[in-house]
């Protein structure tokens, strides 16, 4: 445990507007890599393929729809952050709004790192799958193989990845069972609490009986990465992903980063204080930018880091008890449509930070929004997917990690979303449909 007192967080850090050229200028996706004895890739800097051309008509169609959605939904609902929409690796639409501190003069720019909350799980999951790909673990191993004191039979690495472990959520049980909130919780504390206080825990389900989204799973997976590699989670993520991919504005938060990490704010603009759960990582605590997340998307899409077999494991649906389009893979949410199309995505929410990272694999398109002043509008990005291709179907509000907790926030978007969103959807779809008809006539 770490005392929460006498820690200074969120000193002002000023970011200046730097807008380099489009990402990806080199031509190969086939850079080979080898792994050391701990499963860590010995990777030099990797190169992304050159983005393929998008027609001027298609670019204009998508951009016009994005501008309308941004102006009438995001910007009007207190958005403070970053948005990027890309097609074939080309940035079609990109906007930065607001300041890192409220009030402040540190304008948010392409180099401003924001907390992506549970979108961090995509990195944790792919780190585990990297170790599996390199032969350092079996994802069907029980977690207790690596932590013998862990007394939950049947909980496998796979069930942690796909949220079918049956474990309770540390974000609830620690406080409910009397954790001293003047002490920061660590990942080790989460594990030890599960082991030593098992008899007092409620809501423990049989492993693999059903899907329950649970941050505990990813706090434990971060410990597993450290156990197998002998490296701190942050170092492994940095060396395996951030450095090779030149994600220069990405980092895993630790207390040493307290001076540079931007704070988050509630929908009224009031700062969210640093809390006793805020030092746990694996489930959250990656800070990055929309441009760095585009690099991450492109590296995954062109098999720069992973084999097809590994990606098939990640993107497979594992919770099929109930019919419907929504499902969860290994670290990824997904919408699967009857026409065969699939949206691979993850949302995030922690305090005032929220994010949406949406990957339309069939259309080589990416939609990324990050903010540090809470607005539910960030979760309405599915409309942009339907603009790129109407086959993605009707628009509804996205899932986030703790829907019950999210419902308790009385932000203006929740009160007016139904009317505003319906009007915006209609207007945006009209513009997009008109542009699409014009494009088809020309071709």
Predicted regions and their residues:
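Bacterial N-terminal signal peptides that target proteins for export
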Residues: 2-17
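Bacterial N-terminal signal peptides
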Residues: 16-25
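Hydrophobic membrane-targeting alpha-helices
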Residues: 25-28, 32, 131
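Catalytic loop of the DD-peptidase/beta-lactamase superfamily, centered on the K-T-G motif
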Residues: 29-96, 226, 238, 274-443
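Active-site-proximal loop and beta-strand segments within enzyme catalytic domains
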Residues: 46-49, 99-213
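Short, solvent-exposed loop/helix junctions and linker helices
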Residues: 56, 60-64, 113-118, 154, ...
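Hydrophobic (often cysteine-bearing) scaffold residues that line and stabilize catalytic clefts
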Residues: 62, 66, 116, 120, ...
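Short, surface-exposed loop or secondary-structure junction motifs
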Residues: 155-351
């Amino acid at each position: 445990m770490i005392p929460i007192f006498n820690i200074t967080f969120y000193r002002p850090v000023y970011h200046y507007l730097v807008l380099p050229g489009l990402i990806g200028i080199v031509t190969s996706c086939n850079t080979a890599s080898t792994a050391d004895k701990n499963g860590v890739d010995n990777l030099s800097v990797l190169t992304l393929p050159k983005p393929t051309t998008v027609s001027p008509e298609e670019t204009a169609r998508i951009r016009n729809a994005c501008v309308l959605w941004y102006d009438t939904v995001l910007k009007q609902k207190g958005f403070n952050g970053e948005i990027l929409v890309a097609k074939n690796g080309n940035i079609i639409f990109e906007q930065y709004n607001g300041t890192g501190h409220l009030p402040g003069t540190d304008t948010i720019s392409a180099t401003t790192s924001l907390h992506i909350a549970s979108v961090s799980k995509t990195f944790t999951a792919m780190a585990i799958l990297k170790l599996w790909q390199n032969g350092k673990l079996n994802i069907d191993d029980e977690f207790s193989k690596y932590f013998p004191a862990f007394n939950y039979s049947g909980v496998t690495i796979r069930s942690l990845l796909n949220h079918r472990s049956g474990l309770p959520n540390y974000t609830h049980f620690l406080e409910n069972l009397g954790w001293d909130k003047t002490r920061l919780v660590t990942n080790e504390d989460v594990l030890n609490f599960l082991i030593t206080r098992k008899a007092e825990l409620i809501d423990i389900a049989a492993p693999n009986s059903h899907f329950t989204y649970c941050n505990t799973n990813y706090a434990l997976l971060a410990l597993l990465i450290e156990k197998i590699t002998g490296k701190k989670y942050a170092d492994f993520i940095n060396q395996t992903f951030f450095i090779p991919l030149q994600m220069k504005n990405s980092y895993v938060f630790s207390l040493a980063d307290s001076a540079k990490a931007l704070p988050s704010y509630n929908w009224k603009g009031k700062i969210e204080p640093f809390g006793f759960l805020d030092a746990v990582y694996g489930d959250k605590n990656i800070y990055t930018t929309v441009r760095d997340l585009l690099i991450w998307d492109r590296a995954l899409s062109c098999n720069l880091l992973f084999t097809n077999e590994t990606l098939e494991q990640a993107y497979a649906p594992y919770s099929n008890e109930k019919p419907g389009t929504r499902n969860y893979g290994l670290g990824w949410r997904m919408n699967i449509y009857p026409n065969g199309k699939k949206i691979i995505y993850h949302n995030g929410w922690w305090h005032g930070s929220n994010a949406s990272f949406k990957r339309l694999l069939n259309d080589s398109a990416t939609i990324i929004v990050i903010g540090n002043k809470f607005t539910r509008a960030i979760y309405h990005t599915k409309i942009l997917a339907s603009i790129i291709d109407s086959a993605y179907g009707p628009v509804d509000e996205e899932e986030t990690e703790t829907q019950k907790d999210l419902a308790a926030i009385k932000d203006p978007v929740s009160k007016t979303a139904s009317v505003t969103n319906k009007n915006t959807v209609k207007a945006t779809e009209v513009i997009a449909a008109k542009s699409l008809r014009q494009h088809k006539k020309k071709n």
